[in-house]
Amino acid sequence: MKRVFASFLLLVAPLAVFGQQSSQDEAEKLRQQLKEIEKRLQKVEKQAAQDRIRFGGDYRFEAHSIAATIPDYYDGMALQAGLVNTMFYYGATGQLPTSPAAVQQFIASHYGDYLYFTNSLTFDQLKSAMASFPPQMQQQLMMMLLPGAYRHGYDADNSLMYTNRLRLTMDADVAENVTFSGRLAMYKTWGDSTAVQVFNGQANSFSIDGNTVGVPNSDILRVERAYFTWNNIAGLPLYLSIGRRPSTGGPPMNLRKGELRGGTPMGSLIDFQFDGITVGYHLGEHSTLRFCYGRGYESGFGNGEVLKQPADRLEDADFFGINWDVYSDDNTLLQTTVARAFNITDGFNGLIVLPANPLTGQPVNAPVVMRFTPSANLGDMDIAGVLLKRKDGPFDWFLNVNYVKSHPDPVTTPFGGLFSDPFEVPKSHSGSMWYLGGRYTFNNDHTMVGLEYNHGSKYWFNFTPAQDDIFAPKTAARGDVAEAYLIHQLAKRFFVRLGVINYQYDYSGSSWHLGAPKKLDSKPILGFPTYDDATVVTLSMTARF
């Protein structure tokens, strides 16, 4: 029996081993097949994802050389400090001082009282005190303080500055008739990623929601655009688009950059990152009418409004406008933009380093980063413009005329009111701007040369803090600006650009709706120094992908 059993084992054992080996082979074969299927699925999913989202972008290096001058002026902050100090002296002694030195001696001997006075001072108290002085006394006071506030003009050059800009674009077909578009952007100067500049009176030294990637800021990649568009609503040529809008780089500003139209509104009126809604209707193959809404300041979140009584809270700042491509095809664009901004505030939420207290005029000795929150609604502002842009063979050209009108409330703050100084009663003013340019393309479309010129009047103002100019938005100038440039394609999607811009400012306050414009050759009183002329040479190299 044992022999039979042993023989059986000898017979079965190889079969068992063979069967086990066969099972392992099958399992291994199955695993290989699963891996192959998994790879195919991953490839399909990757392809599907790539089909859903299309990525692109560009990187730009720029080198800038700036030669600028500041004209003779009276330092408004120093003058403000002198007024406040004199108020303290007058309140304690009942008489005007004989000299600024007498005020300083009095402050030194009563410094504790002086600190209490300046810390508790309000702008309304300051205005009331100034209004209580008879004109003769005001003149006497100014004659005493002005000499100490005088500043000789000086150069404000920057021989060489470099910047990096990275933009990543994405588009997706979400569903039938629904699309998504977005753009992330980073823009910085070499050697700085602080994201906050020391305020120097220029609009590009104040970081707000409207210009976070429009002026050099930091190495932070920010959301410049993110919006969906719902087309063919109810079977009509009607669409709805909501989100952070494509509101920068609009025509004709794209021409001088050698780019396609980058934004919807006219770029010489609105070049401002904002969140909003557009309802559009295609009137025909070559005409689109758009109704646009946006919010520039949200009062009810993040500003401590709950801590205030309802009567003391600010209104939201909104705008509503019409943007009509009257006719648009490959060779012609006739466009008009009309808009009103409601309840404009004395600035927008942002981060800032203030060198001086705008109420007391006293210097802020430490570079303190602070959140700036508006303190008042100042009124409404109307803007309107017409643009004709043409392509005739190798020559592109455009004509553009714009208009602005203020509707102020009788409100001022330490920064002023709509087109008025802090101690004035604001009045309605209007301004205008005209702009023309041309570009010639040759060398088998590899090279372009262009010339542009624009002029802004005394009360000209537009919403262009994100305009792609390193020195200042050129279309915001209250004066004359001339630009010449050359763009050459070095390789496919690789470009070099050399540009020169000359600014000749006539009035102060370009880019600002606050403060009264002042003739710059009249030794004006300025809250902050401003340029009267500047020349900017810029070399750019851009890789698009």
Residue spans for each PLM region:
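N-terminal secretory signal peptides that target proteins for export/translocation
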Residues: 1-2
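N-terminal periplasmic/intermembrane-space "pro-region" immediately following the signal or transit peptide
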Residues: 5-11, 18-158, 169, 545
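Outer-membrane beta-barrel pore domains
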Residues: 21-25, 67-68, 151-155, 336-545
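Short, solvent-exposed beta-strand-terminating loops
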Residues: 60-81, 182-195, 343-348, 454, ...
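Flexible, surface-exposed loop regions and adjacent strand-edge segments
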Residues: 72-78, 196-203, 256-262, 297, ...
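Intrinsically disordered, low-complexity acidic Ser/Thr-rich regulatory segments
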Residues: 114-165, 207-218, 367-377, 420-426, ...
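Outer membrane beta-barrel
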Residues: 156-301, 320-334, 430-465
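Outer-membrane beta-barrel signature, preferentially recognizing the C-terminal barrel domain
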Residues: 271-276, 318-319, 323-325, 472-487
